[in-house]
Amino acid sequence: MQKILIFLLLVLSDILSKYFVFNFIDLYQFIKITNFFDITHIHNFGVSFGLFSGTIPSLVLILIGLLVTAFVMYLYINSNDTLERWGLFIIICGAIANIVDRSINGYV
């Protein structure tokens, strides 16, 4: 039960943070947080760093995201290392939030 609550909290915080960026930061505008960390409002229609943007249909990217998430879940289930499991758990939460975003908006 506690894991489900943490899962929901992480996924919702990911989605809410994107909501605030979308509604309060203009497209392509950035906010400097620290010397090495900025928040930038951008729409990613591709994969990592916008690769293949516009060349792969959104539905295909959603299906690939689901397959990769399933593989990471497999790794999570079969891991005996606590730290590794937490890392995989966080990756799964972010991946699911991205799948939700891409399903609703067509981009991440």
Regions found by a protein language model. Give the residues of each.
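Alpha-helical transmembrane bundles and membrane-interface segments of multipass inner-membrane proteins
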Residues: 1-108
